[in-house]
Protein backbone atom coordinates (compact mmCIF):
# COMPACT_ATOMS: atom_id res chain seq x y z
CA UNK A 1 0.00 0.00 0.00
CA UNK A 2 2.84 2.42 0.82
CA UNK A 3 4.49 1.75 -2.54
CA UNK A 4 1.20 2.52 -4.32
CA UNK A 5 1.06 5.88 -2.53
CA UNK A 6 4.62 6.67 -3.59
CA UNK A 7 3.71 6.01 -7.23
CA UNK A 8 1.02 8.70 -6.92
CA UNK A 9 3.62 11.37 -6.11
CA UNK A 10 4.51 13.57 -9.08
CA UNK A 11 8.17 14.16 -9.94
CA UNK A 12 7.90 17.73 -8.64
CA UNK A 13 6.38 16.50 -5.35
CA UNK A 14 9.24 14.01 -4.96
CA UNK A 15 11.84 16.69 -5.67
CA UNK A 16 10.25 19.14 -3.23
CA UNK A 17 10.02 16.46 -0.53
CA UNK A 18 13.68 15.53 -1.06
CA UNK A 19 14.77 19.14 -0.71
CA UNK A 20 12.72 19.53 2.48
CA UNK A 21 14.27 16.33 3.85
CA UNK A 22 17.75 17.63 2.98
CA UNK A 23 17.07 20.97 4.68
CA UNK A 24 15.89 19.26 7.85
CA UNK A 25 18.92 16.96 7.86
CA UNK A 26 21.21 19.97 7.36
CA UNK A 27 19.78 21.56 10.53
CA UNK A 28 20.38 18.47 12.68
CA UNK A 29 23.16 19.17 15.24
CA UNK A 30 24.70 15.72 14.67
CA UNK A 31 24.87 16.34 10.92
CA UNK A 32 26.31 19.81 11.42
CA UNK A 33 29.07 18.47 13.67
CA UNK A 34 29.87 15.41 11.57
CA UNK A 35 32.94 15.22 9.38
CA UNK A 36 31.95 11.92 7.71
CA UNK A 37 28.37 11.20 6.65
CA UNK A 38 27.12 8.02 4.98
CA UNK A 39 24.26 8.47 2.52
CA UNK A 40 22.26 6.29 0.15
CA UNK A 41 22.04 6.59 -3.61
CA UNK A 42 18.28 6.69 -4.21
CA UNK A 43 16.19 4.20 -6.11
CA UNK A 44 13.18 5.49 -8.05
CA UNK A 45 10.80 5.12 -5.12
CA UNK A 46 13.11 6.85 -2.61
CA UNK A 47 13.53 10.60 -2.03
CA UNK A 48 15.83 11.89 -4.80
CA UNK A 49 18.54 13.34 -2.56
CA UNK A 50 21.39 13.13 -5.08
CA UNK A 51 21.57 16.92 -5.53
CA UNK A 52 21.86 17.39 -1.76
CA UNK A 53 24.57 14.72 -1.63
CA UNK A 54 26.63 16.70 -4.13
CA UNK A 55 26.15 19.84 -2.05
CA UNK A 56 27.14 18.06 1.17
CA UNK A 57 30.25 16.65 -0.50
CA UNK A 58 31.68 20.16 -0.79
CA UNK A 59 31.80 20.45 3.02
CA UNK A 60 31.99 16.91 4.40
CA UNK A 61 33.41 13.51 3.63
CA UNK A 62 30.45 11.73 2.04
CA UNK A 63 30.52 7.96 1.74
CA UNK A 64 28.09 5.76 -0.16
CA UNK A 65 27.34 2.04 -0.04
CA UNK A 66 28.52 -0.72 -2.33
CA UNK A 67 26.97 -4.16 -2.00
CA UNK A 68 29.22 -7.18 -2.38
CA UNK A 69 27.35 -10.43 -1.88
CA UNK A 70 25.67 -10.27 1.52
CA UNK A 71 27.84 -7.38 2.71
CA UNK A 72 27.48 -3.64 2.37
CA UNK A 73 30.58 -1.45 2.66
CA UNK A 74 30.96 2.31 2.34
CA UNK A 75 33.32 4.16 0.00
CA UNK A 76 34.13 7.81 -0.66
CA UNK A 77 31.61 9.54 -2.90
CA UNK A 78 32.92 10.83 -6.21
CA UNK A 79 30.20 11.62 -8.73
CA UNK A 80 32.56 10.75 -11.61
CA UNK A 81 33.25 7.28 -10.15
CA UNK A 82 29.70 5.97 -9.89
CA UNK A 83 28.30 3.07 -11.94
CA UNK A 84 25.15 0.93 -11.79
CA UNK A 85 25.73 -1.83 -9.32
CA UNK A 86 23.66 -4.21 -7.29
CA UNK A 87 19.91 -3.74 -7.57
CA UNK A 88 20.34 -0.94 -10.14
CA UNK A 89 21.77 1.45 -7.56
CA UNK A 90 24.68 3.76 -8.40
CA UNK A 91 27.75 2.52 -6.51
CA UNK A 92 31.33 3.78 -6.18
CA UNK A 93 33.90 1.87 -8.19
CA UNK A 94 37.47 2.86 -7.32
CA UNK A 95 37.32 5.19 -4.32
CA UNK A 96 38.73 4.54 -0.85
CA UNK A 97 36.80 2.44 1.64
CA UNK A 98 35.60 4.12 4.83
CA UNK A 99 35.71 1.99 7.99
CA UNK A 100 32.52 2.06 10.10
CA UNK A 101 34.24 3.73 13.04
CA UNK A 102 34.85 6.85 10.90
CA UNK A 103 31.16 7.30 10.01
CA UNK A 104 29.43 9.69 12.41
CA UNK A 105 26.01 10.07 10.77
CA UNK A 106 24.15 7.80 8.36
CA UNK A 107 21.19 8.87 6.23
CA UNK A 108 19.14 5.69 5.79
CA UNK A 109 16.38 4.97 3.24
CA UNK A 110 13.22 3.09 4.18
CA UNK A 111 10.16 1.46 2.68
CA UNK A 112 8.35 2.66 5.82
CA UNK A 113 9.30 4.37 9.07
CA UNK A 114 7.46 4.51 12.37
CA UNK A 115 7.48 7.63 14.50
CA UNK A 116 9.52 5.79 17.16
CA UNK A 117 12.34 5.11 14.67
CA UNK A 118 11.42 1.55 13.71
CA UNK A 119 12.33 0.99 10.07
CA UNK A 120 11.15 -1.34 7.34
CA UNK A 121 13.76 -1.85 4.66
CA UNK A 122 13.64 -3.88 1.49
CA UNK A 123 14.01 -7.16 3.36
CA UNK A 124 17.62 -8.11 2.71
CA UNK A 125 18.98 -6.71 5.98
CA UNK A 126 22.00 -4.82 4.62
CA UNK A 127 21.53 -1.73 6.81
CA UNK A 128 20.53 -3.75 9.89
CA UNK A 129 23.63 -5.94 9.61
CA UNK A 130 25.94 -3.01 8.98
CA UNK A 131 24.52 -0.83 11.75
CA UNK A 132 24.22 -3.75 14.17
CA UNK A 133 27.94 -4.52 13.99
CA UNK A 134 29.84 -3.61 17.16
CA UNK A 135 32.02 -1.00 15.45
CA UNK A 136 29.00 0.76 13.91
CA UNK A 137 26.60 1.04 16.85
CA UNK A 138 27.64 4.61 17.72
CA UNK A 139 26.61 5.97 14.29
CA UNK A 140 23.76 8.50 14.53
CA UNK A 141 21.05 7.16 12.24
CA UNK A 142 18.61 9.42 10.37
CA UNK A 143 15.84 7.48 8.65
CA UNK A 144 14.32 9.27 5.66
CA UNK A 145 11.16 8.75 3.63
CA UNK A 146 8.23 10.46 1.98
CA UNK A 147 5.41 11.51 4.33
CA UNK A 148 3.17 8.77 2.93
CA UNK A 149 5.68 6.20 4.24
CA UNK A 150 5.46 7.39 7.84
CA UNK A 151 3.32 5.12 10.03
CA UNK A 152 2.42 4.98 13.70
CA UNK A 153 3.87 1.51 14.33
CA UNK A 154 5.93 -1.17 12.64
CA UNK A 155 6.60 -4.69 13.85
CA UNK A 156 10.23 -5.19 14.80
CA UNK A 157 12.53 -8.14 15.34
CA UNK A 158 15.55 -8.33 17.66
CA UNK A 159 18.01 -7.70 14.79
CA UNK A 160 16.21 -4.56 13.55
CA UNK A 161 18.14 -1.34 14.13
CA UNK A 162 16.04 1.64 15.26
CA UNK A 163 16.72 5.08 13.80
CA UNK A 164 17.78 7.89 16.13
CA UNK A 165 15.74 10.38 14.11
CA UNK A 166 13.01 10.16 11.49
CA UNK A 167 12.69 12.75 8.72
CA UNK A 168 9.60 12.37 6.54
CA UNK A 169 8.29 14.96 4.09
Give the location of each predicted region.
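Conserved phosphate- and dinucleotide-binding cores of soluble alpha/beta proteins
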Residues: 72-169
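N-terminal active-site beta-alpha-beta segment that forms phosphate/nucleotide-binding
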Residues: 1-102
Amino acid sequence: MVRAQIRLLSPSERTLAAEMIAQEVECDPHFIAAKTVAVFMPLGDEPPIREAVGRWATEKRIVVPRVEGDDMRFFDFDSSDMARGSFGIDEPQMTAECPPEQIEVMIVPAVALARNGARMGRGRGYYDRYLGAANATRIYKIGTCFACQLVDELPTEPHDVVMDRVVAR
